[in-house]
Amino acid sequence: MLDTNVDEETVRRIVREEIQAALEKDPAKKKAAIIASKGTLDWAYPPLILSTAAAALGMEVAVFFTFYGLNIVHKDFESKLRVSPLANPGMPMPVPMPELANALPGMQGMATMMMKSMFRKKNVARIGELHEVARESGVRLIACQMTMDVFGYRQDEFVEGVEFAGAASFLSTARRGHLTLFI
């Protein structure tokens, strides 16, 4: 019979031990490169959650934020990261909505508010908390310098700990990794 009364620390210890054993078998898997190119609230979570999870597994992680993905690490991320129900046909809505209704003014704000509320109810970390976890975990958050130049962003407009580099510099880092994700 499966013991469901195992404490959280025991589970974490077992997972760490299993991951460490796997990494020792294949040390090339110790590096991950993630490219984040989308700048909406629902697309902000995957690169931050995956990068912090990879770091927790002992991997060296670099996340390259380019184009609208820069919104994720911009100081003004709270207002920049929104959800568009029009662009998310699979988004669960509490009340079925005709597609045309999603284009009405105010629907983006309502969808954003609903998603934040769902995350709060399920105790999902906020984006700012994930920034902090990433920094503390040693995840390299890298903003694309070319995209910053195109959009007119300055380095002081980004959250603490963000590095700035071009695509060639990031690719030099990414080519040494075993895992590369484009989000």
Where are these regions (language model features)?
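A glycine-rich helix N-cap at a beta->alpha junction
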Residues: 81-119, 123-126
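A charged, amphipathic interaction segment
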Residues: 108-169
